[in-house]
Amino acid sequence: MNIKIGSLLLLLIVSDISFAADDGIAYLQQEIKVKVEVLDEPCDIAPGDELINIDYGTIVDKYLYINTRTIGEKFKINLIDCDISISDRVAISFSGIENSKLPGMLSVIPMSGQGDVGIGIGFETESGEFIPLSDEKQYKLNEGDNSFTFNTFVQAEIDRLIARTIKLGEFESSAIFHLNYD
């Protein structure tokens, strides 16, 4: 799973529109004032955490038919050099292409490129609380380094469980994690 982050940028555009007449011809004059403020982020992402790969290894379909989902695979987002005078809170969220049959979960793409696999990937807190795509989880920042642990898991679609038609083979998916500072 590829997880990436972008930077913060605040853009404020103010437009003043006025009309002027010269020699009986009306001209539209537009003055655009642009103010850009680049915000200093309170934390840096630890080197190597910009791209996080998660390998589920081998998942036996019978396990999904019995348990509906896998045990969570842990991963961490490590923030370093945090300056809480800039912000002492961060909201973390995940985004990606949503599985239409498993709301709030990522869809997957079979490596063979053919068909629907019948599974999705979910995110949860370290304690097992489900985090739907685009939902933010708020965390308090400490001065210096901070580490946030999450789990991802594979879950089967209900109709595929009932029909016992989970597609076998390798799959992939990607998501983006977002850091929003208060």
Protein language model annotation of sequence segments:
Residues 2-3, 19-182:
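Mature extracellular/passenger domains of Gram-negative fimbrial/pilin and adhesin proteins
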Residues 11-19:
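Hydrophobic h-region of N-terminal signal peptides that target proteins for export
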Residues 2-10:
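Sec-dependent signal peptide recognition
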